[in-house]
Every structure is written in structure tokens, then in C-alpha cells.
Swiss-Prot record:
Gene Ontology CC terms: cytosol
Reaction(s) this enzyme catalyzes, per UniProt: iminosuccinate + dihydroxyacetone phosphate = quinolinate + phosphate + 2 H2O + H(+)
Gene Ontology molecular-function annotations: 4 iron, 4 sulfur cluster binding; metal ion binding; quinolinate synthetase A activity
Source organism of this protein record: Burkholderia ambifaria (strain ATCC BAA-244 / DSM 16087 / CCUG 44356 / LMG 19182 / AMMD) (Burkholderia cepacia (strain AMMD))
Protein name from the UniProt record: Quinolinate synthase
Lineage: Bacteria, Pseudomonadati, Pseudomonadota, Betaproteobacteria, Burkholderiales
Family matches, as HAMAP family: NadA_type1 (MF_00567)
Functional summary from the UniProt entry: Catalyzes the condensation of iminoaspartate with dihydroxyacetone phosphate to form quinolinate.
Family: Belongs to the quinolinate synthase family. Type 1 subfamily.
Enzymatic class: transferase
Bound cofactor: record note: Binds 1 [4Fe-4S] cluster per subunit.
Amino acid sequence: MQSTIKPVEYDRPVAAGTVCGVGQAWAKVPDAPSAEERAALKARIKALLAREKAVLVAHYYVDAELQELADETGGCVADSLEMARFGRDHDAQTLVVAGVRFMGETAKILSPGKRVLMPDLDATCSLDLGCPADEFSAFCDAHPDRTVVVYANTSAAVKARADWMVTSSIGLEIVADLHARGEKIIWAPDRHLGSYIQKKTGADMLLWQGSCLVHDEFKGIELDLLRAEYPDAKVLVHPESPENVVAQADVVGSTTQLIDAAVKLDATHFIVATDLGILHKMQLAAPGKTFIAAPTAGNSATCKSCAHCPWMAMNGLANLADVLERGHNEIFVDPAIGVRARLPIDRMLDFAAAHKKRVQASGDLQRDQQLFANVGAA
């Protein structure tokens, strides 16, 4: 049984300088600065981070120069699980989150006493938009016997309705544990990730029908053709991708797991099915290896892979400097919602820490890594 919701409609901004992402999603993207402007902005941002005693937390999908700034200033470039941990544990009282809104909300939930800023508060997520809190709450009310598990890519209000929050790096293990205890599950919002976990674990899951507009655009037929061009390439796939893409993967995993695979696998070429922003970190982690973007369009298209989130692209040097200078674009979460939303997040973090210790104690790294190895790998 699966839920159904109306497709998300995205409004095109009327201002100039916008960009079309994929799936007809539009976002106001900062103009690219010149080389001189870029150098000046970076210097200004570094000075402002020091002045404000702030730390920059960036996701793998934001532009390379923001990732570089985070690394150079003692911040963090990571997936959403590590971003959550880092922001919670860092001494800085001001967190600047370069990513999309749910990441800023999660940082605020875990650090309610800290100031959380974002370059652009309109940077959202199709998974978040596709799972309105009121509709999801009604769906949960209709199935009161089920444990509610939600993906990190959701609003604070949706997290507050959940029993567990998960990220792609730990979701499979958590669902497997719940299934072993005989629990039936409501999963939201990504249908592809939910279906993948359902097949790997055999869990009884009702799937909310959301999707990531970037990963949903990857094409199985075109990927098969690209693999024929690069027969020795390993295929790295994020599990938010459609089933016919996941089925061709050598490795299925979170952003961090895909980067690790690029480093550890004995291959020189990799086809990567996730947001193009990750290629910066892959190239740094595995110099000398070649990374090829998986196709999101057919042979007749002028752009074979447009796999970059338009909302991630809203994070730029200029608006990052501006938010540090002015102290605006602060994230606020209703305290009552924040308290409830923290419970499923803390459950995930505690589970992840305990799971890591179990794996390290057993020394069975191969078993752990194979949790995200695709059973139908080519």
C-alpha cells in the first residue's frame, strides 16, 4: 500500500538572473563573481567568520568554493548526518549552514541556544515541499499501529511527528533493526530510498510518494549506454535514484559512502549518479581518478547531465558574506516543535554511535559495507 499526493508545483521567480534546475524547479541563484570579486569575498568571509566567532557547515552539494571555505576556516563539509553532529558538538555559538532549509532547521533543533544563519532562507528541497506536515500527520493518524520513520529531508514539523529520523547513511540499518523487532513502518518522504530499503530489509513499509527532483531525473537507459562507453567504470549511485538506475550500481550509498568508495575501489573511472556538487570532494579525495556524471537526459539533449540542485545553488559567496555582515536570515524553530523533533534525531544519532562501536568491536567491516552494496550490481 502506498500513499498518493498531488505533484509539487514550482513557481518561476520573476527576477532576472534565475536558473532552471531540473523538473521545472526554479531558484534565484546569485550571479557568479569575477575572479577579483571572488578573492575579495573569500577574504571578507574569513574575517567575518573570525569576528562573529562563527563556523561554516557546508553540504557536499553546494558549490566548490563554499566547500573550500568551510575546510579552510575549520568548518565542516559533510553529509547531513555529519553536519548534524558537527553543529551540535562545535563550540561556536553561531552556525552558518550552507545547504538547504531543512539542514538549518536540524542544526537549530540540535542547538536551540545557538544562532543559526543561512545564506538564503528560500533554499528549500523538493522532498520537504512534497511532504506537507498537515497531510503527513493525517496519513500517520490513519495508521496508528506503525512506527513513523522520516528522512532528514523534511521540515521540523514533520520530524516532530516522527518516531525516528534517518539519513541515507544509517537509514537501512535502522529500518533493519525495527523490522527485526517486528515493527511495521511508515516511511517518508522519498519513495525511491524507501523502496530500496524495503527490498533490502523485507520490512513492512508504507511509502510516502515524494522524490528528489535531482535524483529522480537520472535515466536508466541512458546510464546503460554510458556504461557501454566506459566498460571498466564503477557506477556509484545515491539511493534516492530510480530503481532502474540503482539496479546498475556497483555501490549504492550516501554521499560520504560514495566518496569512500571512490577512494577505496580499485578503479580509475567512476560514473556518479548524485548531485554534481559531490565531484569536488571526490576529486580531492581521489586525485588521478576520473569522475563522469550520470546522464539525466537523452542523446538529443544539449545538456546530458544537469544534476545540480537549484536550491543548493542559491548558496553563494556574496550572500554568505552578507548574512555574516548583517546577521539576518536566522533560522527559528518553534520551541515546542523543536523539542518533539529532537527526539527522533537523537534516537538516530545514538543508534549510529552504537552501531559504529558494534562494527568496530566485531571488526566485521565487510558486512557493514555490504549493507549498501546493491544486490543486482552489474
